[in-house]
Amino acid sequence: MNFLKKMIKSCKDEETQKYPSASAPPDDDDIWMPPPEYVPLTQVKGKASVRNFCISGEVKICSPNGYSFKILRHILKSFDNVYSGNRRMIGLVKVVIGLVLSGSPVPEGMNWVYKLRRTLIFQWAESHGPLEGEELEYSQEITWDDEAEFVGLQIRVSARQCHIQGRLWCINMNSRACQLWADMILQTQQSPDDENTSLLLE
């Protein structure tokens, strides 16, 4: 039976020696969508809590036997239960993971590495989101292991509030990121002041 758990197991040097070839990147075993579009900031409306964050995100996938988009989605469906970071910023982390995994992976030994560096604008509904000046350094490994196959996700997200003008992230319903956000149950609501803006509730 497939199950998720946080494990000490990681992609160590001896595993790299055992499997010298990098696993294949995700194939088209599921819908492959283009990455989401960014919408330039023109005007922020309403009383939502607005924060500019300089983001550095990385997801390293360790899989000796290859991995698929379906497996990544399966792993992230239990994200709420295994997330070990600041709960006030879990929504931001979900957004970043979705955007990171929408990019192109770079092979690194037996691993595939997805990276993202952006300045993004996040809007939270009132009473939600991080405190003023709050920063995040989040690092966690989540694994999927059914005794026949092993896939490990090493996730790192760094977020600090900055004054560089960023971009709004938007939910493009045809994007791979949107599928991942749906799997992670990203909680949003439509802004009462702007029908094209989603506010984070977590």
Curated annotation (Swiss-Prot):
The miscellaneous annotation reads: Most abundant protein in the virion.
Give the subcellular location: Virion membrane; Host endomembrane system
What does the record note on quaternary structure? Answer: Homomultimer. Interacts with nucleoprotein and with the cytoplasmic domain of glycoprotein.
Which intervals of this chain are the motif PPXY motif?
Answer: 35-38
Q: Which GO terms describe its biological process?
A: viral budding via host ESCRT complex
Which keywords label this protein? Answer: Host membrane, Host-virus interaction, Membrane, Phosphoprotein, Viral budding, Viral budding via the host ESCRT complexes, Viral envelope protein, Viral matrix protein, Viral release from host cell, Virion
Q: Which InterPro entries does the UniProt entry name for this protein? A: Rhabdo_M, Rhabdovirus_M_sf
Q: How does it sit in the membrane?
A: Peripheral membrane protein
Q: Organism source for this protein?
A: Mokola virus (MOKV)
Upper classification of the organism:
Viruses, Riboviria, Orthornavirae, Negarnaviricota, Haploviricotina
Q: What is its main location?
A: virion
Q: Where is this region: Essential for glycoprotein binding?
A: 115-151
- Please identify the protein, giving its name as recorded: Matrix protein
Q: Which GO terms describe its cellular component?
A: host cell endomembrane system; membrane; viral envelope; virion membrane
Per the record, what about its domains? Late-budding domains (L domains) are short sequence motifs essential for viral particle budding. They recruit proteins of the host ESCRT machinery (Endosomal Sorting Complex Required for Transport) or ESCRT-associated proteins. Matrix protein contains one L domain: a PPXY motif which potentially interacts with the WW domain 3 of NEDD4 E3 ubiquitin ligase (Potential).
**What is the annotated role of this protein in its UniProt record?**
Plays a major role in assembly and budding of virion. Completely covers the ribonucleoprotein coil and keep it in condensed bullet-shaped form. Inhibits viral transcription and stimulates replication. Plays a major role in early induction of TRAIL-mediated apoptosis in infected neurons.
Q: Which Pfam families match?
A: Rhabdo_M2
Family of the protein in this entry = Belongs to the lyssavirus matrix protein family.
